Regions:
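A short linear-motif detector with a strong N-terminal bias
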Residues: 2-4, 22-25, 114-118
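Stable alpha-helical elements in mature extracytoplasmic
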Residues: 2-9, 55-62, 82-85, 92, ...
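Residue-level detector of functional hotspots within protein domains
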Residues: 8, 29, 121-123
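Extracellular/periplasmic periplasmic-binding protein-like sensory domains
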Residues: 10-83, 152-155, 167-174
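Segments of small-molecule ligand-sensing domains
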Residues: 68-79, 90-149
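Sequence contexts marking disulfide-bonded cysteines in secreted/extracellular proteins
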Residues: 133-135, 155-159
Length: 175
């Protein structure tokens, strides 16, 4: 669902008198439109990037580029992840110089086993397709996002994740 759809759902819940103890939302809801909606007070939002509300040089750089390219677009976690991917591409492509080919780029990307995009997010291992187990929760208070957990940094305990085995990429085709 989109942020707008979720805001509409939260409005409908309020009208119906339904007030759950916890509203726990995923990272795509780290969007000023949710916080300023007037119906998300107290909602928790998971993120795996540095909060926009806290000082961070890498987030400042993202915001500078967003301002140049975005035409007034608000920063979002998904935007930060896209920016990180672009930085990773630029780093590896730049290191190849005149040897930039598709195969060399893929080989170069598989060699990157620690990537934090200069501090945009906790380090992860894109070369081996291994995400980190780090989380950070924000909470909507007074129409703004504030840090809820942990007090600083990220919680990077492996207990934050669960291993699920199986091939979830194949959808059976009905005949």
């Amino acid at each position: 669902t989109t942020v707008d759809q979720t805001v509409q759902m939260l409005k409908a819940m309020k009208v119906a008198g339904f007030a759950p103890k916890v509203v726990d939302l995923a990272q795509q809801y780290y969007d000023p439109a949710l916080a300023s909606s007037g119906v998300a007070e107290g909602a928790y939002v998971l993120t795996n990037t540095q909060p926009f509300e806290e000082p961070n040089a890498a987030i400042d750089l993202y915001n500078q580029w967003l301002k140049k390219a975005g035409g007034g677009t608000a920063p979002t976690t998904l935007g930060v992840e896209s920016f990180s991917a672009g930085l990773l591409f630029a780093k590896v492509a730049g290191s190849l110089g005149s040897h930039l080919t598709r195969d060399n780029l893929i080989t170069g990307l598989t060699k990157v086993t620690s990537w934090d995009a200069g501090g945009l997010h906790p380090s992860q291992n894109p070369g081996q397709n291994i995400a980190n187990s780090c989380v950070l929760y924000l909470q909507v208070k007074g129409g703004k996002f504030v840090r809820a957990f942990p007090d600083k940094g990220f919680s990077c305990n492996t207990a934050n994740t669960a291993h699920v085995s199986g091939d979830f990429g194949k959808v059976p085709v009905e005949k």
